Amino acid sequence: MSSLDCKNPNHGKPIKNDPWHIYTDGSKQGDLCGAGLVVYLRGKLWQGECHGYHLQPENSVPQAECYGAKQAALFITKNQRRMHGAVSIFTDSQTTLMALNNYYIKSELVSETSDLLDRAAGGINTTTVTLRWIKAHAGHEGNEKADECAKLGATRVQLTKNATILCSPPNRQTVYAAVGQACERPGVRTSGSPVSAD
């Protein structure tokens, strides 16, 4: 079962009951665009899993943020046999949360990410996958590391021995097209008020 949580009542504090926390982020500085993710198990960085993904200069910050969530879903799908228990995916992008919660998805990237999240939640060992909002630059270690990975991915700097630098970006699609629609996806939990784009 997957769910989306657009408003975290704890102001972005990590959920301690979920053993797996995956933090994602996107970055764009001039023509440098990237996404990043880091994986934690019970509060500790898991096996050096820090990934940065290089995107094309024409990609936007919302695309990079959504691409980070897509890579988190792919990571869960690829590692289902090793991952037991609930997984929280944290993003500081309310735009991504709103786009993924929209029933009428117009962006190919958002649609692919949504499908992958559903597939990740239907895995062998994963009980639930929840995409949650976390406040940016508020001192959360995982969020700060994901931000660093996104910036390093944008510049194609090697992150760690396990790092991934992706040179083929998603198709240029706009996440904004999926934001602001009134309909919600059936079976997906959301909370919170409408938000503006990041």
Model-predicted segments: where are they?
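Residues at secondary-structure transition points
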Residues: L32, G36, Y40-R42, L159, ...
